[in-house]
Amino acid sequence: MPRSQRNDNFIDKTFTVVADILLKVLPTTRREKEAFTYYRDGMSAQAEGEYAEALQNYYEAMRLEVDAYDRSYILYNIGLIHTSNGEHAKALEYYYQALERNPYLPQALNNIAVIYHYRGEQAIESGNSRISNLLFDKAADYWKEAIRLAPTNYIEAQNWLKITNRLEEAI
């Protein structure tokens, strides 16, 4: 039984019902409907922390989905799972792939920045300030782009850019 048919959560059930109605009403192909079902099931599994199941659903959705914009969100969610699992290099690959298909995805830019910032912090702990500055500069570049796309979001990043004197080149 597909995950979407066994949701216990009221919000998930409501989303599933609305999505099913839209899929019936909108002119979409069978393949597009199937891709969306896998994507929806992936989101549901991901929300419950069932990452292996979520990845299986996302990979199946990727196999079926042809629209670049829709694929960008699938790739972004795969990146989120790898980030949650501490697999930052793999997460970056998926965030970059998502941005190739949809350059207007500020949340992917933000997550890339967070990973570079984290790596910068690790470099400081290792006593390598030169590398940390390079990583922080890279994080700043991605945060500036995310802020440009979504100016009211990422307040903590904006504050960090100000505190570290990296805001001047921003916005």
UniProtKB/Swiss-Prot annotation:
It is found in: Plastid, Chloroplast thylakoid membrane. Disulfide bonds: none annotated. GO terms for biological process: photosynthesis. GO terms for cellular component: chloroplast thylakoid membrane. Keywords: Chloroplast, Membrane, Photosynthesis, Plastid, Repeat, Thylakoid, TPR repeat. Transmembrane segments: none annotated. TPR repeats lie at residues 35-68, 72-105, 120-153. Pfam families: TPR_1. It is a peripheral membrane protein. It comes from the Eukaryota. Its main location: plastid. Essential for the assembly of the photosystem I (PSI) complex. May act as a chaperone-like factor to guide the assembly of the PSI subunits. Belongs to the Ycf3 family. This is Photosystem I assembly protein Ycf3.
